[in-house]
């Protein structure tokens, strides 16, 4: 039986910390930026750590054999 492939879409969007947490970029910065303050736009830069429930789902989907 061949090896299972990792999902490429998930591979491009998420990274893992050494302790197993999932890092993703901030959502909500593609459009409608006019109505936001400069501070809000600044805070949307960079990455964030997902909550444990979402991180578990990503790991289950990202790694074919699970953790």
UniProtKB/Swiss-Prot annotation:
An annotated GO BP: translation
Recorded GO MF terms: structural constituent of ribosome
Protein name per its UniProtKB record: Large ribosomal subunit protein bL35
Similarity field: Belongs to the bacterial ribosomal protein bL35 family.
Keyword Zinc attributed: no
Gene3D superfamilies noted in UniProt: 4.10.410.60
Superkingdom, natural source: Bacteria
A GO CC term attached to the entry: cytosolic large ribosomal subunit
Organism of origin: Rickettsia prowazekii (strain Madrid E)
UniProt xrefs under InterPro entries: Ribosomal_bL35, Ribosomal_bL35-like, Ribosomal_bL35_CS, Ribosomal_bL35_sf
Gene name in the database record: rpmI
A Pfam cross-reference name: Ribosomal_L35p
Keyword terms, alphabetized: Ribonucleoprotein, Ribosomal protein
Key word tRNA-binding present: no
């Amino acid at each position: 039986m061949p090896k299972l492939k990792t999902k490429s879409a998930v591979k491009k969007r998420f990274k893992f910390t050494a302790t197993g947490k999932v890092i993703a970029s901030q959502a909500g910065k593609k459009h409608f930026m006019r109505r936001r303050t400069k501070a809000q736009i600044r805070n949307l830069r960079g990455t964030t750590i997902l909550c444990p429930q979402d991180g578990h789902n990503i790991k289950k989907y990202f790694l074919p054999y699970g953790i």
